[in-house]
Amino acid sequence: MKIGFIKDVDGYRAPVHPESIDKYTADIHLEKGLFDYLNYSEPKNVKTISKLNELDIVACVENIQHKVVKNLKEGAVLIGIFDFDKINEIKNLRPDIKVFSFFKLPRISRAQNLDALSSQANLLGYASVLRAAKETSDVVPMMTTAAGNIQPSKVLILGVGVAGLQAIATAKRLGARVWAFDIRKEAKDQVESLGAKFVEASTEAQDSVYAQEVSDEENQKIQEALKKQVIESDIVLTFAQIPGKKAPVLIEKSTVENMKENSVIIDLAAGTGGNCEGTE
């Protein structure tokens, strides 16, 4: 059996760690330059992929190119962290291959060692705060100098799942003042346990594990509740998504136009439409 590991379109992540490759008993093939961005050396004595249509199993992380899918052999197995839209896109392109996505794994104890989605979401939350801190022209923590005090940045986080919680924790460790919002009932306790302040909206909190779609009227109330917070924030990070559906728009274009100069928005829901109006 031939197993191939290939790069994502952006090349930032690899579907396998170099140290794990020796554990496989199958015939392993790697795409050339798979670990270049990660600063790992290519493992020795491992074959380079020459033809995709010779591989029985192909693993990637998330962003796979159409030309790669088209070149897979008939009956091949494709493994990755694909959302519902991506799965349908791949199946429409190649109905003759099998697609397995970690995105669809149930959140149960027996499957915890396969929960790649949570690990990636944790990294996303962490990396997004560091990227925002790099992009803003302000310092994140409070600083006391002989010339006076520099106030800490205000960070607003929308969507408090795994990524959002990690973003809160990271921003707090950097010394920011943090506010957060989520429509789920359990989110308030989670936010406050990390030392952040919860933004209240005049909508009914959801009791579900995952956020569910709300009416246009309810969404309008959420936008109004968040408007003042967004305008006053130095950094806004959005993670709000609804499984299998378009991401809710939480920030209107008019709100963005009224934000402070040099403030930063990073929309992590851009792949499903975005939480910020105008996200591309």
What are these regions (language model features)?
Residues D8-V9, K32-F35, N63, D83-F84, ...:
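Short, ordered loop/turn segments at secondary-structure junctions
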Residues K2, K67-S153:
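Glycine/serine-rich phosphate-binding loop and adjoining beta1-alpha1 elements at the start
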Residues T25, K44-E54, I64, S208-V236, ...:
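A structured beta-alpha segment of the ubiquitous adenosine-cofactor-binding alpha/beta core
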Residues G11-P15, H66-N71, I242-I251, C276-E277:
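Glycine/threonine-rich flexible loop motifs
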Residues D83-R110, A247-E280:
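Rossmann-fold NAD(P)-binding glycine/threonine-rich loop
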Residues M1-D96:
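An N-terminal-biased, well-structured beta-alpha scaffold segment characteristic
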Residues D8-L30, F35, P141-Q229:
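Glycine-rich phosphate/diphosphate-binding loop of Rossmann-like nucleotide-binding domains
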